[in-house]
Amino acid sequence: MTADKEKKRSSSERRKEKSRDAARCRRSKETEVFYELAHELPLPHSVSSHLDKASIMRLAISFLRTHKLLSSVCSENESEAEADQQMDNLYLKALEGFIAVVTQDGDMIFLSENISKFMGLTQVELTGHSIFDFTHPCDHEEIRENLSLKNGSGFGKKSKDMSTERDFFMRMKCTVTNRGRTVNLKSATWKVLHCTGQVKVYNNCPPHNSLCGYKEPLLSCLIIMCEPIQHPSHMDIPLDSKTFLSRHSMDMKFTYCDDRITELIGYHPEELLGRSAYEFYHALDSENMTKSHQNLCTKGQVVSGQYRMLAKHGGYVWLETQGTVIYNPRNLQPQCIMCVNYVLSEIEKNDVVFSMDQTESLFKPHLMAMNSIFDSSGKGAVSEKSNFLFTKLKEEPEELAQLAPTPGDAIISLDFGNQNFEESSAYGKAILPPSQPWATELRSHSTQSEAGSLPAFTVPQAAAPGSTTPSATSSSSSCSTPNSPEDYYTSLDNDLKIEVIEKLFAMDTEAKDQCSTQTDFNELDLETLAPYIPMDGEDFQLSPICPEERLLAENPQSTPQHCFSAMTNIFQPLAPVAPHSPFLLDKFQQQLESKKTEPEHRPMSSIFFDAGSKASLPPCCGQASTPLSSMGGRSNTQWPPDPPLHFGPTKWAVGDQRTEFLGAAPLGPPVSPPHVSTFKTRSAKGFGARGPDVLSPAMVALSNKLKLKRQLEYEEQAFQDLSGGDPPGGSTSHLMWKRMKNLRGGSCPLMPDKPLSANVPNDKFTQNPMRGLGHPLRHLPLPQPPSAISPGENSKSRFPPQCYATQYQDYSLSSAHKVSGMASRLLGPSFESYLLPELTRYDCEVNVPVLGSSTLLQGGDLLRALDQAT
């Protein structure tokens, strides 16, 4: 029994030994086969001898697939193959990247040996592995799109459907540091690779070896060259003369540019700062550059293809740009974009204009020649060269269109000295009947000889110290300024004169004297003043802060200057107008000659409220033409002129009693100072349907005074009924009794000589309408001899702007109690001897009658309405 057991045990052990020996033999044979297979790989012996079986299998399969690809694509000519073998080492040295062959499934079947130089990973470590194991997960979808072969037209972009070429960017793991050291794969960083190549299609086996007559599907692989993008801070090789650096914001606006761009493309670095790089790309390359910009923002680095950048003086150059996003080391946020620009060619098609920036060089030589016209300082030379300039621009209309202003630019009027090119007005004169020339027309004829001798481009002259006319309306300026709104229209169809309006906006609007500057300041203050409502029943308004009050207090004998107003800006004359226009004077002289007797005195109501009167009350002051820009962008309300007031001819027939104020002087036709200009009288009916109902501030003030008079007369009658006609007691009642007495006797106290408001005419006749109508006007200025009149002035504008500049005295209060200025009016008593309420700008804006003066609340009615509302 024991012998049998030993035999069985020995047999099993023998079988085990045999199996172990067989396995050992198989492993040795397998190792021998793998060893032989490893030696068959195109690898050095030092590398292949240390490979494990899995690596040998992976590399062998990759080699076989690569060999099949090469055999189906490349030629079998050995001579060419030998030449390629000799050039292999030179290729790798010349390339700035490595070669990779990736199958449709993503397996990297071939990688060049120099991959370790750029990525740190060796060829053996990566060959046979999937590309998705070493690339960024966000790039996998893009990699799959580039690996697949699209046959249908409904897939992807048209460019990929029609071509097998590929150009994309991917991020791959890199184990080499900036200093050249190699780290572990777990510590690897992402490096952007620019992959360019094409898709190759090949068969898996020859057609005659196909199984059962079925053809195997076509195999495709992607052959690409991967070029890593070098970081700008790690460039060791200095840039050549055909390369320049630039820094941009994240939206590709220039923040820095190298000086080399000037000699390469023509731009100066200062011209590019703040401008987008898209402004200088060729239109056909803008789509590719937009895609490159998107890749740059998503992946951090990009290399643009060859694109065209427009040169400054026409044409373009071919460029290639490497862009890198610089991140903030603190918060890892993108900070800017650094670009290395390689100029690949010279300027091509430099005679072709591709953008508006390149048009400057075409006109610059001509413009420089034109600028030389104005180098000479002589008047004759300027006149001749200005004619040459007009002829030059007329011959070249394209150049004239280039010099035309764009919307928003200032309009600068060009005056060529002699007006030989103006449109003739014979057409309008042939239709309209001849009329008597106005004063402005006579003046234009008298100054025509002087205008011909002026230079082509004149500088506005400063006005005289006593003149309130801006320099744009002086006689020394070559620009003719309209004096009335009718001058802005032609005589045929009342169309606006374009050339006159252009001159209006082109003239110098700066104030030349101190009065106009201070007046603008006062108008600014008026905007912030609140209306003053007294509590004692007397509705007197505050007067604006005018600098003339201080001047009048110091020099009572001097003629007060007029405050300018913002109510008359463009549609009012630019200078103070003579109170008695020649048209008005001629009219009254004709009436006096026809009657030969002194007419009867009309009642006050008929004088001031005659709606059908054609004579207008001469305004005391005008307004300088000031555009909105000089007022700080504030809107300036344009007001129509006051309705005409009719004065009786008797006010003008008493010229023999004027020697009392100024002394004796020879009689003659009255004249106006040189700064006074006349204008054609406008009718108040030309401003809408309001017509005669529109009252001027002076007329409103007069009506208020008449109401006050009636109220005081009623109170006086009440006092007489109570006290039997004796003056009532008390200071307030005593003053009221004095006022009623003065009103009854016709010798009411007048206001001190100061301007009531910037918008109310400072006319003593309107301030004292209750004066006896039979009293002569004794304070009219004497006429000047004809020799004192300047030849350029109008012979018909005679009267000075202030015919009633009389220094009246207030007899109701002593000089110590006379108040002046804003502070004194606030602190002083409200029963001051002002019988004419002062109107401010707010009164004129709020109390403008709309349908008639009868619908407005005034005085006590207004106070009662306000009390009921509150």
From Swiss-Prot:
Residues 84-154, 230-300 form the PAS domain. Residues 26-53 are annotated as: DNA-binding. The modification Phosphothreonine is found at T840. Changing P534L: In ECYT4; impairs interaction with EGLN1 and VHL. The keyword Heme does not apply. The keyword RNA-binding does not apply. One of its GO terms (molecular function) is RNA polymerase II-specific DNA-binding transcription factor binding. Residues 171-192 are annotated as: Required for heterodimer formation with ARNT. The modification (3S)-3-hydroxyasparagine is found at N847. Gene3D superfamilies: Helix-loop-helix DNA-binding domain, PAS domain. Keywords: Activator, Angiogenesis, Congenital erythrocytosis, Developmental protein, Differentiation, Disease variant, DNA-binding, Host-virus interaction, Hydroxylation, Nucleus, Phosphoprotein, Repeat, Transcription, Transcription regulation, Ubl conjugation. PROSITE patterns: BHLH, PAS. Residues 1-24, 460-486 are annotated as: Disordered. Changing F540L: In ECYT4; affects the interaction with EGLN1 and VHL. Residues 304-347 form the PAC domain. Expressed in most tissues, with highest levels in placenta, lung and heart. Selectively expressed in endothelial cells. In normoxia, is probably hydroxylated on Pro-405 and Pro-531 by EGLN1/PHD1, EGLN2/PHD2 and/or EGLN3/PHD3. The hydroxylated prolines promote interaction with VHL, initiating rapid ubiquitination and subsequent proteasomal degradation. Under hypoxia, proline hydroxylation is impaired and ubiquitination is attenuated, resulting in stabilization. In normoxia, is hydroxylated on Asn-847 by HIF1AN thus probably abrogating interaction with CREBBP and EP300 and preventing transcriptional activation. It is found in: Nucleus; Nucleus speckle. Transcription factor involved in the induction of oxygen regulated genes. Heterodimerizes with ARNT; heterodimer binds to core DNA sequence 5'-TACGTG-3' within the hypoxia response element (HRE) of target gene promoters. Regulates the vascular endothelial growth factor (VEGF) expression and seems to be implicated in the development of blood vessels and the tubular system of lung. May also play a role in the formation of the endothelium that gives rise to the blood brain barrier. Potent activator of the Tie-2 tyrosine kinase expression. Interacts with HIF3A. Efficient DNA binding requires dimerization with another bHLH protein. Heterodimerizes with ARNT; heterodimer binds to core DNA sequence 5'-TACGTG-3' within the hypoxia response element (HRE) of target gene promoters. Interacts with CREBBP. Interacts with EGLN1. Interacts with VHL. NCBIfam families: sensory_box. It is linked to Erythrocytosis, familial, 4: An autosomal dominant disorder characterized by elevated serum hemoglobin and hematocrit, and normal platelet and leukocyte counts. This is Endothelial PAS domain-containing protein 1.
